[in-house]
Design a protein with these regions (language model features):
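C-terminal catalytic domains of large/alpha subunits in multi-subunit enzymes
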Residues: 1-15, 19-22, 80-87, 94-97, ...
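Flexible, low-hydrophobicity surface segments
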Residues: 1-91, 143, 156, 172-173
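Phosphate/pyrophosphate-binding loops at sites that engage ATP/ADP/AMP, CoA/4′-phosphopantetheine
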Residues: 120-124
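Glycine/serine-rich anion-binding loops at beta->alpha junctions
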Residues: 127-140
Length: 381
């Protein structure tokens, strides 16, 4: 494996291009990332910048430091809930010839860096996407507009930052679904309706790309916002249903044409996930493999353990990273990634891997009708 600092400029450009394709936003691939200098938006803010945080009513409170602003806003540390998981989309009528059914619940994207931006008076705000797009979780973040507005108001640089609790309450989720599929790959997918018609159109088109014989219905659901921007939203669920009617070695083909397979096996008491991916020219095998491994981690948690509990008003009750059921590193299987030779144009491959691993993980449960299919992970408050 090449050490990033030894890459030639051409090799580094190729690595960053692959990372851009997988993450959806420009990425930095070099030693600085490992040293904590990844280029996140908040890293470049002036040290004397004011700090703005949200109060309990959703208004911005400004202070000389983050601690001052949080104190003024009355911010309370989030906790996890003991409430049971709910499946918000009711299962539609299931015909007698249906082969499989599936219901999913709310899950939290749980991206590493909460939304942040900063802006000087009269300037352009730093992008909250920073060194990555949080797989669609930050596409509509409010922090850049807030930083610009507050910098002009106070005539000083302002950092606008969301807490982890804010990202959970405000950030978009993948829409929960309920649906079924027949052996001939026709089916029905009922999707929690996102807020915009554009999102609904995008979801409908992406689902049709992988499951052309599916009917898609949108239903209103009380809950946090959902969006088509979240990784493989809608089409991954449809692809998983379709894959359940095919041989396990059949590839999952994403709307962009990337293909992937996944298999889960026991090897001396240790779980191993084998992934095969075809996504055009690799550009950088190390970067591509790392994104595929990350996609496998995300998929396994989605199927087995992740959920986000909301109250009757749709407000999330789980407000800490540990409460989301994200698969712990100690519980992560070994992931083997085979990259298929392909001289075609490079395209995103990890989203296809995400869907393929989810399909394999679901198969391993015996096609449990609800996700999360395993016991919910609880590792503290």
């Amino acid at each position: 494996v090449d050490d990033p600092p030894t890459r030639s400029p051409i090799a580094r450009e190729a690595a960053e291009r692959r990372a851009h394709l997988e993450g959806g936003r420009p990425q930095t691939v070099d030693r600085d990332v490992a040293l904590g200098r990844a280029g996140f938006a908040d890293d470049s803010a002036p040290p004397d910048a004011l700090v703005a945080v949200l109060d309990t009513e959703g208004g911005w409170v400004v202070g000389e430091s983050r601690a001052d602003a949080r104190r003024e806003a009355g911010t309370v540390q989030g906790r996890r809930s003991t409430a049971p998981v709910r499946w918000p989309v009711e299962m539609p009528a299931v015909p007698g010839d249906a082969a499989r059914t599936l219901q999913t619940t709310w899950v939290e994207p749980a991206y590493l860096e909460p939304d942040a931006s900063w802006c000087a008076p009269g300037g352009e705000p730093a992008s909250p996407l920073g060194n990555g797009g949080a797989f669609g979780g930050k596409e509509r973040s409010p922090v850049a507009a807030a930083a610009r507005r507050l910098a002009d108001r106070y005539d000083r640089p302002v950092r606008a930052v969301l807490s982890r609790e804010d990202t959970v309450r405000l950030g978009p989720k993948r829409p929960p679904v309920a649906g079924w599929v027949r052996a001939d790959e026709s089916g029905l997918l009922t999707v929690a309706a996102p807020q915009t018609t554009d999102d609904r159109s995008i979801l409908r088109a992406s689902i049709a790309a992988v499951a052309p014989d599916f009917e898609v219905r949108f239903v209103p659901v009380v809950g946090p916002p959902s969006a088509s921007t979240v990784r493989a939203a809608g089409w991954a669920e449809a692809a998983v249903l379709v894959a359940s009617c095919r041989p396990p070695e059949a590839p999952v083909v994403a709307p962009n044409g990337a293909a992937a397979t996944a298999a889960i096996r026991d090897e001396g008491g240790r779980e191993v996930v084998s992934v095969w991916v075809r996504c055009g020219t690799s550009l950088d095998d190390t970067v591509l493999r790392s994104y595929c491994a990350g996609a496998a981690h995300m998929a396994l948690g989605w199927v087995r353990s992740e959920s986000l509990v909301v109250d009757d008003g749709g407000v999330p009750l789980d407000l800490t990273i540990r409460s989301f059921g994200v698969l712990r590193a100690v519980d992560m299987p070994q992931v083997e990634v085979t990259i298929a030779p392909d001289g075609g144009p490079p395209i995103n491959g990890s989203d296809a891997v995400f869907a393929a691993v989810a399909a394999a993980a679901w198969r391993a449960t015996g096609f449990a009708p609800r996700w999360p299919a395993g016991e919910r992970v609880t590792v503290g408050g």
